[in-house]
Swiss-Prot record:
GO terms for biological process: cell division; chromosome segregation. GO terms for cellular component: Ndc80 complex; nucleus. The keyword Coiled coil applies. It comes from the Eukaryota. This is Probable kinetochore protein SPC25. Residues 8-134 form a coiled coil. Component of the NDC80 complex, which consists of NDC80, NUF2, SPC24 and SPC25. The keyword Hydrolase does not apply. Its main location: nucleus. It is found in: Nucleus; Chromosome, Centromere, Kinetochore.
Length: 237
């Protein structure tokens, strides 16, 4: 019986040491991949911003040209209304006005089409940016098992200073309180007949949930226990 107990103790310590190494390796992978992804996203967003700036400048130019044509049309109409000369001169002025008006109409059509195209390009770029963000999010969800493990056990710290207790502290909850912990009593580690117990956990966790976590700890091992603990702590107040 004693040998089996020692085997369980050795196994648990080995699991914790392996988990610690996995977390350290996974953290390096996470940092490297996040940095690379951030660089790619930053480069992509800068290209989009540069393209949008160019489109905006072109749009301002087109709008300015349209305003100029409108002012010119207004001046021409006013000049014709004030025209007081011979029929021949009036006819020449009118013919010139009609030619110029037709030319301006065609130019305005071209400018309006250019403006419509620019507005469509703006909308297309905005959609591309949104799709790229969604792609990055989907890619992150498909990342390697190491990153998934680290995210599930995000910020895990293991305190083995007390030989009778193991303290697991989780951080990065994104709230005002930045850490939550659970303490496991391992004083009976070398006795197979005595299951491991949770000595201390956050006050918001119910007794029935504690019992469920202890069952996971004793039946499924320390890694699955820690994953389930973090899920519970995330939900607890």
């Amino acid at each position: 019986m004693e040998n089996n107990g020692k085997s369980r103790g050795t196994q648990l310590v080995g699991q914790i040491d392996d988990l610690t190494r996995e977390l350290q390796d996974a953290q390096k992978v996470v940092v490297s991949r996040i940095n690379e992804r951030n660089r790619l996203v930053s480069d992509m967003m800068e290209r989009y911003r540069s393209n949008l700036r160019i489109l905006q400048e072109q749009r301002v130019t087109v709008l300015s040209e349209l305003d100029r044509y409108k002012e010119e049309e207004s001046r021409m109409k006013e000049a014709l209304q004030n025209l007081n000369s011979t029929k021949e001169e009036f006819k020449r002025e009118m013919d010139a006005y009609q030619l110029k008006a037709e030319k301006m109409r065609l130019q305005k059509q071209q400018l309006q089409k250019q403006l419509d195209d620019l507005n469509k390009m703006f909308a297309d770029r905005a959609n591309e940016i949104q799709k790229y963000k969604e792609m990055v999010t989907r890619q992150r969800q498909l990342d390697s098992p190491e990153i998934k493990l680290y995210e599930k056990l995000l910020g895990l710290q293991i305190d083995k200073a007390d030989t009778h207790m193991l303290k697991f502290t989780f951080t990065d909850f994104g709230r005002e309180r930045e850490y939550k912990s659970v303490i496991v009593d391992v004083s009976q580690l070398n006795d197979d007949s005595s299951p491991l117990r949770i000595k201390e956990i956050e006050s918001g966790v119910s007794a029935s949930t504690v019992n469920e976590l202890e069952t996971v700890l004793n039946q499924q091992g320390i890694v699955q226990f820690l994953i389930e603990v973090r899920k519970v702590l995330v939900k607890s107040e």
